[in-house]
From Swiss-Prot:
Signal peptide: none annotated. The modification Phosphoserine is found at residue 251. One of its GO terms (molecular function) is 3'-phosphoadenosine 5'-phosphosulfate binding. It comes from Homo sapiens (Human). This is Sulfotransferase 2A1. Changing residue 246 to P: Decreases of the sulfotransferase activity toward DHEA; decreases of the sulfotransferase activity toward pregnenolone. Changing residue 258 to L: Decreases of the sulfotransferase activity toward DHEA; decreases of the sulfotransferase activity toward pregnenolone and. It comes from the Eukaryota. Belongs to the sulfotransferase 1 family.
Amino acid sequence: MSDDFLWFEGIAFPTMGFRSETLRKVRDEFVIRDEDVIILTYPKSGTNWLAEILCLMHSKGDAKWIQSVPIWERSPWVESEIGYTALSETESPRLFSSHLPIQLFPKSFFSSKAKVIYLMRNPRDVLVSGYFFWKNMKFIKKPKSWEEYFEWFCQGTVLYGSWFDHIHGWMPMREEKNFLLLSYEELKQDTGRTIEKICQFLGKTLEPEELNLILKNSSFQSMKENKMSNYSLLSVDYVVDKAQLLRKGVSGDWKNHFTVAQAEDFDKLFQEKMADLPRELFPWE
């Protein structure tokens, strides 16, 4: 196993925990069930935060489950070896996560009533968060510098491919009734209201005190202190420095890292790539 990428259908994956044959099975053979709830994101867009919220919604705010079972078991990654196997044996209703672009997602989803919550985030913050996260992980190709990672991200030669392609692939689904589009920014700005929106989408109701418990137990500080959610359980086989894996949980951190030239270049790239999508889709713009 090397610090490189596994390539499948032109998309990069880690070399540990993923296999081309499993990725093919996920797309062609995995059966999505109508009761499934799926968290769909491009990496570093708030996946674990949303998973924590959904787990707490399931337990009505009670923290016992999230404090006793690792987050990757509560919401497994369907495309990973472990996740694919576990989910195939899990009874309904299932909660799981995926970073897959639309062309690699299980085909069975498109004829199912399963519910997808797609969480997107300002790609500038995604870029910064990804740089600090991935450089601490083993079994992936690492950039020599921040500048090199910036270039890779703009070109789409990073894990799970281009952010722009990921968004473009999934956005046509946003009008479907089993697809909820959210942004990290709105979740951050008004977490309570966004949780209510998720409840409405999933057909769930929460008492005010249950909502307050969810807000308390899914806060960044609570997650950082919860060893089942903060990655501290990850084996040293996977990680270089665990301290960096849950960093800030804020919006706008990119301003502390982009040079003026990088900010200008990225603005130009964003305008070019996203010109065909309505501006109001992106609350950070």
